[in-house]
């Protein structure tokens, strides 16, 4: 056999082997389950927990955001004033509670005792005057009205004496437990108001809750905002999830933890890798976004696939082809 013929046969054999191997690989690739899904759209609406005038925003749409980053601030002044008032309230309540615990000073007790002596003298005088008036009334020297006035003065002096005696007794025995408990409760209430004022002031600073990309900027500085009004919308970029749906007959192939290959139109020959992270326990009618025609009238189960080697080319909402072929487990 001539040498050119031998070379030609060898080349033909090599081509045949390559073609056969390609056919075998593709047939093996097509043997497994194929689903169609989308990269999950995950967003967070960011807002202030308190209301007020928006003083500043530090980010624009498209900016990369880091968790803990300061995004903007409200006008602090009203909340700083409220904090000062709350601190003063705690000081007043603390002083009152300390007074209740300490009881009364010796000077106050001495003043109360002097008031009792003064009230006692006034009462004694009023009682003696009333006694004299009684004698005069019996001898018809004064009128009944004069006697009644003397009795009224005596009764008033007696009430004043009783009040002074009670006050002296309180000063000597100290404050009642109920009064001390009430003062303590007032102090705790003032401390709670202070803590809330501190939290409100802290909440005038808008902090990023997670890493992501700023999707929308809904308001501008100078706007008056209510608590909870959306200021920014953040698109969460990590972790990347793919949402897909599987019918009941293929449900057994979708155990959590199974390795998956994910293909996009932009990378048809270079798949992403992922793992099944969640399989819905309940069936639902196929969402309109599912691209597979033969699933649209079925009851299906939702899958969440966690992409383990995601990059910035894998965008939210992007359609993805999900491959469950057996070779995935060994890649």
UniProtKB/Swiss-Prot annotation:
Its Gene Ontology cellular component terms are: periplasmic space
Q: Which residues form a coiled coil?
A: 107-208
Location relative to the cell: Periplasm
| Signal peptide range | 1-19
Kindly state which keywords UniProt assigns to this record, in alphabetical order: Coiled coil, Periplasm, Signal
Q: Which domain of life is it from?
A: Bacteria
Q: Name one Pfam family in it.
A: HlyD_D23
Entry similarity comment: Belongs to the UPF0194 family.
What's the protein called, per UniProt? Answer: UPF0194 membrane protein YbhG
In the UniProt record, the gene name given for this protein reads ybhG
